[in-house]
């Protein structure tokens, strides 16, 4: 049966990806998006061969288009290492597309679990979601690192604009064979945007907000994060938070990691770039699976976002797929990349029909899993060593099951 397509007034940016996620991405579009929406898609192929062919210009162009149209939906992509350079015969070991996009958009990545009642959690005490906000600019991800050969002095030098009066810090006096060195940075402007985005997210959810740093060791670097967050809170959010019955608090990263493990959830955790990289995967596993995690990059303007799956390109499954074998790849996080991006488009455009559609598609995913229709990774969490083939669906069967569930929900709403 055909459905009246919902008209989406403004375009979205689509960033295609690699390997198995590229395969499921097309299936999601063909079965869950295009049959129901009249949608203007600005398409960018971020698959590794096309990034190589364009000298990675396509990645920059996709980020610039996101700034123009405010909504991007991204498939998982390969970040090449030495082995990938050989495999694809690349011109260069291109940077992480996520890193490039995040640095252009200068946003905060918020990750949150997709909770299904029948999927057991490794941390059973987590009865409420934990939303982790990762500052997606600077620190180790924009650092200059080097191998030091031999003895010598390592210095850090700052030369203020318009003057020759430089400030010099002696970092270390190397003796013997040498070692390694790293210089990294962040900006007040970016940290302030991170603070605003985190405060806003927690306020929308009516959850408390925690910022974690190691300001006892990095007194100036992490201390700056702590001070700026406090300034932003006092100036713009304190009265709103008190009214909503929520709070903001700074905690040391080690203390916060321990607290997270024993808490029940139900808060936003603002992390510096590296901490957020690590802790978001820790949270995903604790809640059940990286395949059950949403990931949205929120920009400082509050109206530009990029939604993506929180996992990689599922290379192992792709190798099986290439040989014509059966795969059972979890597409939920990729489906939620589409729903979260389209939901934001709906909010910006004041499109209630589109917003309702995204809610029904998310409910269809969760409904399918809770009715026992799931991919192998989720079935394994439930059945463990007793897992058999009839416990799970293959890649396409699962997307078909979600499509059936979605159609049933749309028809029910029509009736």
From Swiss-Prot:
It catalyses: D-threo-isocitrate + NADP(+) = 2-oxoglutarate + CO2 + NADPH. Coiled coil: none annotated. NADP(+) binds at residues 77-79, 84, 262, 312-317, 330. Its cofactor is Mg(2+); Mn(2+). It is an enzyme of class 1 (oxidoreductase). PROSITE patterns: IDH_IMDH. Keywords: Cytoplasm, Glyoxylate bypass, Magnesium, Manganese, Metal-binding, NADP, Oxidoreductase, Tricarboxylic acid cycle. Its EC number is 1.1.1.42. SMART domains: Iso_dh. The record marks 141, 214 as: Critical for catalysis. GO terms for molecular function: isocitrate dehydrogenase (NADP+) activity; magnesium ion binding; NAD binding. InterPro entries: IsoCit/isopropylmalate_DH_CS, Isocitrate_DH_NADP, IsoPropMal-DH-like_dom. Binds 1 Mg(2+) or Mn(2+) ion per subunit. Mn(2+) binds at residues 254, 277. It is found in: Cytoplasm. One of its GO terms (cellular component) is mitochondrion. Substrate binds at residues 79, 96-102, 111, 134. Belongs to the isocitrate and isopropylmalate dehydrogenases family. Heterodimer. NCBIfam families: nadp_idh_euk, PRK08299.1. This is Isocitrate dehydrogenase [NADP]. The lineage of its organism: Eukaryota, Viridiplantae, Streptophyta, Embryophyta, Tracheophyta.
């Amino acid at each position: 049966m055909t459905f009246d397509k919902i008209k989406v007034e403004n375009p979205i940016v689509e960033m295609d990806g690699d390997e198995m996620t590229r395969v499921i991405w097309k299936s999601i579009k063909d079965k869950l998006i295009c049959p129901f929406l009249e949608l203007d898609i600005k398409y960018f192929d971020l698959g590794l061969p096309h990034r190589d062919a364009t000298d990675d210009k396509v990645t920059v162009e996709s980020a610039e288009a996101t700034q123009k149209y405010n909504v991007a939906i991204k498939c998982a992509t390969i970040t090449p290492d030495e082995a990938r350079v050989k495999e694809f015969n690349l011109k260069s070991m291109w940077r992480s597309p996520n890193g490039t996009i995040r640095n252009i958009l200068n946003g905060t990545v918020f990750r949150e679990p997709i909770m299904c009642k029948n999927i057991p959690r490794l941390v059973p005490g987590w009865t409420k979601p934990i939303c982790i906000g990762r500052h997606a600019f600077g620190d180790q991800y924009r650092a200059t690192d080097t191998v030091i050969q031999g003895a010598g002095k390592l210095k850090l030098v700052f030369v203020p604009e318009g003057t020759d009066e430089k400030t010099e810090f002696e970092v270390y006096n190397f003796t013997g064979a040498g070692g390694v060195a790293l210089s990294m940075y962040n900006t007040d402007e970016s940290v302030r945007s991170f603070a605003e985005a985190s405060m806003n997210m927690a306020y929308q959810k009516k959850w408390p907000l925690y910022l974690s740093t190691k300001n006892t060791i990095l007194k100036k670097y992490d201390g700056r994060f702590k001070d700026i967050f406090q300034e932003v809170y006092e100036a713009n959010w304190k009265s709103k938070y008190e009214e909503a019955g929520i709070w903001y608090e700074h905690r040391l990263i080690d203390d916060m990691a321990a607290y997270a493990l024993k808490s029940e959830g139900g808060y936003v955790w603002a992390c510096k770039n590296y901490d957020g990289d690590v802790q978001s995967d820790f949270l995903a596993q604790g809640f059940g699976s990286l395949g059950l995690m949403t990931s949205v990059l929120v920009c400082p303007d509050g109206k530009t976002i990029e939604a993506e799956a929180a996992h990689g390109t599922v290379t192992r499954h792709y190798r099986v797929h290439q040989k014509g074998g059966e795969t059972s790849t979890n597409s939920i996080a990729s489906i939620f990349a589409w729903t979260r991006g389209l939901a934001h488009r709906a909010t910006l455009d004041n499109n209630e029909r589109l917003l309702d559609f995204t809610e029904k598609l998310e409910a269809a995913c969760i409904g399918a899993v809770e009715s026992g229709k799931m991919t192998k990774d989720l079935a394994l969490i439930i059945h463990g060593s007793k897992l058999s083939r009839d416990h799970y669906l293959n890649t396409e069967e699962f997307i078909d099951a979600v499509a059936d569930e979605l159609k049933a929900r749309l028809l029910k709403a029509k009736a």
